[in-house]
Amino acid sequence: MTSPSLVFENDKLILYQHELGEWDNLNHLIICKVTKHACIIDPFDGRFWYDFCQNKGVKLTHIWLTHTHWDHVKGVDELLELTDNQLTLKCHILEQERGYSSDKASWWTHGEFSQVAENFGALEFSIHCTPGHTPGHVTIIGNEVIVTGDCLFLGSCGRPDLFGGHKEKQRQSVLYLKNIFQTLSPNSIVLPGHYYQIDDGSIPKNSILSDFLKINKAINSAHDVKLWQELPFLSFDDNMAEQARRQRAKES
């Protein structure tokens, strides 16, 4: 297996990105330079990240989840087992609405379209509740880093037609984040949960914020309900959509 790519570094942190799994998941490991503590976001493979941290001589202390679809939590239990449950696992409590539970988790409880501060090592980030793809999806921002999970991809956004998703809340989350982005350095790095081809034919895995704001169709359509409704990536006629319809019917 290939090694993670060092995709961003400043005076406070080092950030590694790695593709894992058959769904092109992008995992992100943030290392605090001061304390040598590390936080893994949405781990797909627990053993992979445990071994990587051991080899790097850093202490993995935190797991943060942008949301709880299976491909974003697959490595959580293995990491907890490998570290004798010594990791801090954080997730938004609204993810319980789609059935996620863990007796090892600590829960963010702030409201939709709002933020709270969260620390690990000597680093502070803001955790923004951005529902739509799932009820308790969060976007992680701080220190020139933006981890969008499945709320926003580089050219599009996550689908809101799965169980627990909500198309209008997804639009509101995109508008909310667009306003937040206006306050950030244009050289901040945007890190999505998956990567797909964009209009110029390239398939980037990250982008600086200034470029991202130009190419992202969701960001540039969310202000207009009609344009938003016409976006082709908000819903799909596939097995996952059918499963979501059945789950909603079961819960109603």
Which residues fall in each region the model found?
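Conserved beta-strand hairpin/beta-sheet module of binuclear metal-dependent hydrolase folds
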Residues: S3-K56, T139-G149
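Active-site-adjacent loop/tail segments of enzyme domains
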Residues: C157, D161-F181
